[in-house]
Design a protein with these regions (language model features):
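Glycine-rich beta-strand-to-loop/alpha-helix junction loops that act as flexible
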Residues: 172-174
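Active-site entrance/lid segments in N-terminal catalytic domains of soluble metabolic enzymes
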Residues: 1-170
Length: 174
């Protein structure tokens, strides 16, 4: 929690631009506390891939509201009926629950249009868009399955990834 607070605090120093963090969904243990620390420092964007971050939008909603947040936790060798959950209560970690926390925008990092479609339908909260990675993006050793839907003129190519807005953010002025 402290490390992410410091990283975001320092990243915000000296400018008025947006700051985001990229967390790996598969590294489950630190994510709840990491998100809280970053949000306390004024985080603008959360990007998550390396797994299916279906629960993260709701986690962001709950942390911003100073409520208990939970994530399912994968346990190797667990049976199908076992439910393992990580939980994080901001109040239990000394959070000032009267302080207003801004919920950061959430971008899911995906390598296939089927995953983007699944997240758009089944995510537990609101995602503002997707980063669609190509097969040569960092850490990938196999081509993406399916096709990458990048026909919309609003899509922006960033080398081996495309940023695709799921819903326009109408609260901002350009």
């Amino acid at each position: 929690m402290l490390a992410n607070f410091v990283e975001v605090f320092l990243a915000r120093s000296g400018h008025h631009g947006a700051v985001g963090i990229n967390l790996l969904t598969k590294l489950q243990l630190p994510n709840l506390a990491s998100l809280h620390g970053a949000m306390l420092a004024g985080l603008n964007y959360v990007l998550m891939g390396a797994g299916i971050p279906r629960e993260v939008p709701l986690v962001l909603d709950r942390i911003a509201s100073h409520e208990m947040a939970t994530l399912h936790f994968d346990v190797e060798g667990a049976t199908a009926g076992d439910a393992h959950v990580l939980s994080f209560d901001p109040a239990a970690h000394g959070a000032d629950v009267t302080r207003v926390l801004t919920r950061p925008q959430f971008l899911a990092i995906v390598a296939a249009n089927s995953l983007a479609a699944t997240l758009a339908r089944k995510a537990s909260g609101r995602a503002c868009g997707f980063v669609v990675e190509g097969p040569t993006a960092g850490g990938h050793n196999a081509p993406a399955r399916g096709t990458v839907p990048c026909r919309a003129p609003a899509n922006r190519s960033t080398g081996n990834a495309w940023v695709i807005a799921a819903r326009p953010n109408r609260s901002r002025t350009s």
